[in-house]
Amino acid sequence: MNIYSVIKKPLITEKTTIEKDERNIISFVVSSDANKIEIKDAVKTLFNVDVASVKTVNVAGKVKRVGKNIGKRSNWKKAYVTLKEGSNVDFFEA
């Protein structure tokens, strides 16, 4: 898989910002068919950082209703990337 199609976007929330500051863990929304090795290589190449570990979570889409119509949001995959000591990604800085 192409490294530019592995990572879709960073996941920036209050919780992920705290994780970044306290434990040096950054979060990404990644392609559903990407594995941990591809995610690790993509983060290393795109951001020039050393990766310690990668954890992934498959997030199930919620069932939503608008009036009589029932639909389902898409499933997606989230990756928690732990960086080695001294590594930093700049887009999380304000």
Curated annotation (Swiss-Prot):
One annotated GO biological process: translation
The UniProt record lists the keyword GTP-binding: no
Protein name per Swiss-Prot or TrEMBL: Large ribosomal subunit protein uL23
Gene3D superfamilies named among the record's database cross-references: 3.30.70.330
Cellular component per GO, a single term: ribonucleoprotein complex
Quaternary structure note: Part of the 50S ribosomal subunit. Contacts protein L29, and trigger factor when it is bound to the ribosome.
SUPFAM superfamilies: Ribosomal proteins S24e, L23 and L15e
InterPro entries per the UniProt record, alphabetical: Nucleotide-bd_a/b_plait_sf (IPR012677), Ribosomal_uL23-like (IPR013025), Ribosomal_uL23/eL15/eS24_sf (IPR012678), Ribosomal_uL23_CS (IPR001014)
Transmembrane segments: none
Gene Ontology MF terms: rRNA binding; structural constituent of ribosome
Protein keywords: Ribonucleoprotein, Ribosomal protein, RNA-binding, rRNA-binding
Stated family: Belongs to the universal ribosomal protein uL23 family.
Domain of life: Bacteria
Biological role: One of the early assembly proteins it binds 23S rRNA. One of the proteins that surrounds the polypeptide exit tunnel on the outside of the ribosome. Forms the main docking site for trigger factor binding to the ribosome.
Protein source organism: Geotalea uraniireducens (strain Rf4) (Geobacter uraniireducens)
Keyword Ribonucleoprotein: yes
